[in-house]
Swiss-Prot record:
The keyword Protein transport does not apply. It comes from the Archaea. One of its GO terms (molecular function) is transferase activity. GO terms for biological process: purine ribonucleoside salvage. Belongs to the purine/pyrimidine phosphoribosyltransferase family. Archaeal HPRT subfamily. This is HGPRTase-like protein 1. The keyword Metal-binding does not apply. SUPFAM superfamilies: PRTase-like. May catalyze a purine salvage reaction, the substrate is unknown. Keywords: Purine salvage, Transferase. It is an enzyme of class 2 (transferase). Its EC number is 2.4.2.-.
Length: 182
C-alpha cells in the first residue's frame, strides 16, 4: 500500500465549516486518480475481501470506480446503489443520515439470498453504510463482506451492529494532515 500511503500524505486538507476535510483522488476525484494507485487499491481489496460472492455492491459515487475495477478483475457483476430513483419495479429506497447530510438512495438488482461484497472508498460516520446494510438485510440478501479503502477513526453508526468492516487503512484527519493508524 505504498502508493496509497504516499497519496494520503500528498492530499490537501481543507477546512469546511470547522471540519478538516481530506481531498483525495479515491474519495473526491481530485487530484486526478493515477492508474497505479487504483491498481494498488484493487489488489489490496482483492486480497482483503471474501470474493466468493454473487455480486459486488457499491454506493454512488466514489465507490463506483473502485468496484468497477474490482468487477473487471474478478468477473463478479457490479450493482451500484444510486442517488437517483428510476422507478423500476424492483427498486428499493433507503434513507441515509451522515455526519453532514440526509438523503435517499435506491437499490435495484438485489434479491433475497444474494451473497454480497460491499465496497466503498471511505467509512467516516458510518451512516451511509449502516443504511445500506439495513436495506440489504430487509431485502434478504447476505452481506458476506464489507471492504473500504479508508476508515476514519472515531464513532461510527456501525459500532452497535453485527457488521464487520475491513479497511485497507485506518486514518484520522486534522488541519495538519492525515495520520495513518497501523
Amino acid at each position: 500500500m505504498e502508493k496509497l500511503r504516499e497519496s494520503l500524505h500528498e492530499a490537501p486538507i481543507i477546512d469546511k465549516d470547522g471540519y478538516s476535510y481530506l481531498v483525495h483522488p479515491l474519495s473526491n476525484g481530485v487530484p486526478m486518480l493515477e492508474p497505479e494507485l487504483l491498481r494498488e487499491v484493487v489488489v489490496g481489496v482483492t486480497r482483503a475481501a471474501d470474493l466468493d460472492v454473487d455480486k459486488i455492491v457499491a454506493p454512488e459515487a466514489m465507490g463506483i470506480h473502485i468496484a468497477t475495477a474490482l468487477s473487471l478483475q474478478t468477473d463478479i457483476p457490479l450493482v451500484v446503489i444510486r442517488k437517483r430513483s428510476y422507478g423500476l419495479d424492483d427498486e428499493v429506497p433507503l434513507h441515509k443520515t451522515t455526519g453532514y447530510s440526509e438523503s435517499e438512495m435506491f437499490i435495484n438488482d438485489i434479491e433475497a439470498g444474494d451473497d454480497l461484497l460491499i465496497v466503498d472508498d471511505l467509512l467516516s460516520t458510518g451512516g451511509t453504510m449502516a443504511a445500506i446494510c439495513e436495506a440489504l438485510d430487509d431485502i434478504g440478501a447476505d452481506i458476506s463482506d464489507i471492504v473500504v479503502v479508508f476508515r476514519k477513526q472515531g464513532e461510527s453508526a456501525l459500532d452497535d451492529t453485527d457488521y464487520d468492516v475491513t479497511s485497507l487503512l485506518d486514518i484520522s484527519v486534522d488541519q495538519d494532515g492525515v495520520t495513518i493508524h497501523d
